[in-house]
Amino acid sequence: MIARVLPQGEIKVEALQSLIVSDIPEGQAIEYKSTINISDDKAKKNLCAEVASFANASGGDIVFGIAEKGGKATALEPLPDFDGDKVELQLRQIFNTHIEPAVPGLRFCRVEIASGESALVLRIPQSWSRPHALLAEIPQFPVRDGNRKRPLKLRELRDLFGASASIAQRMKQFRVRADASRP
């Protein structure tokens, strides 16, 4: 499993500033976005591909509100007119429309940069229901590979489907044993 770059739990502005000061590059567990671009279908599908690629790999964080150059964080860029609840609802609707199966466990963490200014960290867990496909004419199965996303190879896809079936079978066996042990 890949270690997270940002701390678990509440994320403070100091953690985001340390990404810049420490010259932390985008990688297997983190991606930087200066804005939340969901203005057109191409932008929505690109963001969905990022989410699915993290879920299909080891999970990770997408940080909205950090400018990057050459894959390295360069500056905090507060999100303009940020309404956390509205943005979360919009993003969840987009993800549920374009990713199958839905990615469980997404967390949206608002980070106050200054009075009235915010960034957003989208925490994507490694999914137990992977592989996740982008819905299109031909479904695509992206996976995070270092600081980029790429399509899953056929062998990897077979392995993930097999692992998913194995997890479902183990959960079913656990429930049967739990029910059998009840008085």
Specify the residue positions occupied by each region the protein language model found:
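Conserved N-terminal catalytic/coupling substructures associated with nucleotide/phosphate chemistry
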Residues: 1-183
